[in-house]
Every structure is written in C-alpha cells, then in structure tokens.
Design a protein with these regions (language model features):
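N-terminal cap/lid segment of alpha/beta-hydrolase-fold proteins
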Residues: 1-22
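Active-site glycine-rich loops that stabilize anionic/oxyanionic intermediates
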Residues: 34-38
Length: 144
C-alpha cells in the first residue's frame, strides 16, 4: 500500500500494490483502473491470480472510491466540474510511481467500464508521457 496526494491537491489517493512471493523472475506489471462505485479490493482475486504467474499488480482507488473516499464526501463523487482531469492524472501518477519501482518490466494496463474511459484519456493525452506494452479495455463504450 502507498498513499499520495491527488492532483486535485485535496484527496489522498490509495495505491494498492500486489507482488509475487517469488520476485526473482518478474514477468511484468499490470495496472488496474476500476469502474464506477468499485475499488481495488474488488480485484484481490484477479491480483492474486496474476501475482501467482509472476506479475506485479497495482491500482488506485480513484477519488470518491474505496480508501480514497474522504470523510464526509459522497461515494462515487469525483469532485467539482473539471475533476475528470484530476482522475486521469492520478491514474497516470500510479503509472509513474510503478515505473520508478520497476523500470525494466513490461507494463500493461486494464480499464474496466469507467476505468476504460480513464485509461483511454490517459493514453491519448499529449501532455502525459505514457509508454505501455499492452492495454485491455473491458466494458467500454464508443465515446468517453
């Protein structure tokens, strides 16, 4: 577990990191970006499966979700108008933090539902430098 200040300068983001027991032969990293009303804890079994195969798995509870839910804030509330950009930047901060820790590992990202829109925005943003080796968009739509 790792916490960092959100790009909104208010929320504290909760980054969950799952690592294989045997760290001698790591195959890659998988970042999960969850959907609306979810949190990283819902992906524990998925993370356990991939760590058993040699992958480091990570993801944040986005603003208004899971451990990133602030006292008194509403569940699934992303913030005031314009907050979408903060959410995208926070997911990118997770990417940046994990690349610092494991710079040589291949990097894959999975976005589910709303998380797929976040991932698409992050990858298409010209000001966020993101280099990944694979992307899985699950339950996405045609327009974010």
């Amino acid at each position: 577990m790792f916490n960092f200040k959100s790009s909104d300068k208010d929320a504290v983001m909760h980054l969950e990191i799952y690592t294989p027991e045997d760290k001698s032969n790591l195959k890659g990293m998988i970042q999960i970006c969850h959907g609306m009303t979810e949190y990283m804890g819902r992906y524990d079994k998925v993370a356990q499966y991939f760590t058993s195969k040699g992958y480091v798995v990570c993801g944040i509870d986005i603003i208004g979700h899971g451990h990133s839910l602030q006292n008194g804030s509403r569940k699934a509330y992303l913030g005031k108008k314009g907050s979408w950009e903060y959410v995208v930047k926070d997911v990118h901060t997770c990417y940046t933090e994990m690349k610092k820790r494991y710079p040589k590992l291949p990097y894959y990202i999975v976005g589910f539902s709303m998380g797929s829109f976040i991932v698409r925005d992050m990858l298409l943003s010209p000001h966020l430098r993101t280099k990944i080796d694979g992307c899985f968009l699950i339950g996405t739509g045609s327009q974010p």
